[in-house]
């Protein structure tokens, strides 16, 4: 135990618990609630000042960095599984979902204002997942039109059904095709890349091929302790892009607003 920090030990426990609960939940639905609490605990740690300070102080510790990578992979997998489970409840209580979406608008207001997203926007959302709350908020509360992309067909099925239950079919479409193969990409005013998208450079390259000259990219990412729940973006991945608005910081992730360099 000597030399192990409290944060390191806490993260070790969380990784083990999240991995086990993700497996158990597939056999016993009651485990999903416990899994949700563990993910909430991880989210809480990321937002705590003391955890951030300890992460910064130990940022050169190879054991902590390796653990962070393992924990992120476990957390991302768990969240994807949990979202699919939660979708089943959402489909039975569409009214509750509507009220929840209304309350979320302020949480993404900074991104909307910085990127200029309004009712005339056409947003391509890459990595939308089974429960695409940001996309649903944009369609329901802002009036934007969206195309949600995900490589997980099961997740798309859930998301499509939730959009139908919310009466948003006219404003939301869904696809598993790459951005470069979608006609929507050429007319999109904005591209939103989820923080859980790992291959950000590949997605940026595809978007660059087809995007309008005046379109903007909202790139959600996590660095430092926020990388425990989100994939980072490296400076080299931003070659050919320029930041066109101040970085938007959220408790769990940050957002860069990008446009083509030299346009």
From Swiss-Prot:
InterPro entries: Nicotian_synth, SAM-dependent_MTases_sf. It is an enzyme of class 2 (transferase). It holds the Pfam family NAS. Induction: Is part of the operon cntOLMI that is negatively regulated by zinc level through the Zur repressor, which leads to transcriptional activation of this operon under zinc depletion. Disruption phenotype: Cells lacking this gene are unable to synthesize pseudopaline and are impaired in their ability to import nickel in a minimal media, supplemented or not with nickel. Under more stringent conditions where a chelator such as EDTA is added to a minimal succinate (MS) medium, a condition that presumably mimics the chelating environment prevailing within a host or in airway mucus secretion (AMS), the deletion mutant strain is unable to import zinc, therefore reconciling the regulation of this operon by zinc with its function as a zinc importer operating in metal scarce conditions. One of its GO terms (biological process) is nicotianamine biosynthetic process. Catalyzes the nucleophilic attack of one alpha-aminobutanoate moiety from SAM onto L-histidine to produce the intermediate (2S)-2-amino-4-{[(1S)-1-carboxy-2-(1H-imidazol-4-yl)ethyl]amino}butanoate. Functions in the biosynthesis of the metallophore pseudopaline, which is involved in the acquisition of nickel and zinc, and thus enables bacterial growth inside the host, where metal access is limited. Therefore, this enzyme probably contributes to Pseudomonas virulence. Cannot use D-histidine in place of L-histidine as substrate. This is L-histidine 2-aminobutanoyltransferase. It comes from Pseudomonas aeruginosa (strain UCBPP-PA14). The lineage of its organism: Bacteria, Pseudomonadati, Pseudomonadota, Gammaproteobacteria, Pseudomonadales.
């Amino acid at each position: 135990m000597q030399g192990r920090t409290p944060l390191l030990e806490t993260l070790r426990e969380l990784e083990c618990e999240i991995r086990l609960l993700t497996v158990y939940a597939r056999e016993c639905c009651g485990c999903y609630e416990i899994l949700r609490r563990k993910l909430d605990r991880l989210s809480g740690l990321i937002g705590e000042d003391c955890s951030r300070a300890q992460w910064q102080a130990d940022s050169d510790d190879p054991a902590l960095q390796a653990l962070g990578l393992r924990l992120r992979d476990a957390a991302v997998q768990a969240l994807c599984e949990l979202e699919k489970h939660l979708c089943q409840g959402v489909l039975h209580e569409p009214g509750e979902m509507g009220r929840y979406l209304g309350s979320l608008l302020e949480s993404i207001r900074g991104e909307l204002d910085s990127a200029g997203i309004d009712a005339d926007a056409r947003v391509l959302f890459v990595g939308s997942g089974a429960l695409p709350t940001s996309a649903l908020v944009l369609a329901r509360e802002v009036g934007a039109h969206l195309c949600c992309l995900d490589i997980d067909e099961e997740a798309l099925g859930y998301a499509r059904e939730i959009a139908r239950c919310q009466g948003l079919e006219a404003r939301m479409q869904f696809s598993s095709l790459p951005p470069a193969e979608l006609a929507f990409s050429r007319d999109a005013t904005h591209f939103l890349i989820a923080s859980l998208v790992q291959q950000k450079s590949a997605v940026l390259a595809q978007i660059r091929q087809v995007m309008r000259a005046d379109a903007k990219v909202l790139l959600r990412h996590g660095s430092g302790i926020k990388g425990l729940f989100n994939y980072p973006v490296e400076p080299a991945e931003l070659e050919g892009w320029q930041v066109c608005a101040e970085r938007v910081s959220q408790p769990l992730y940050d957002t860069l607003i990008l446009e083509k360099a030299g346009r």
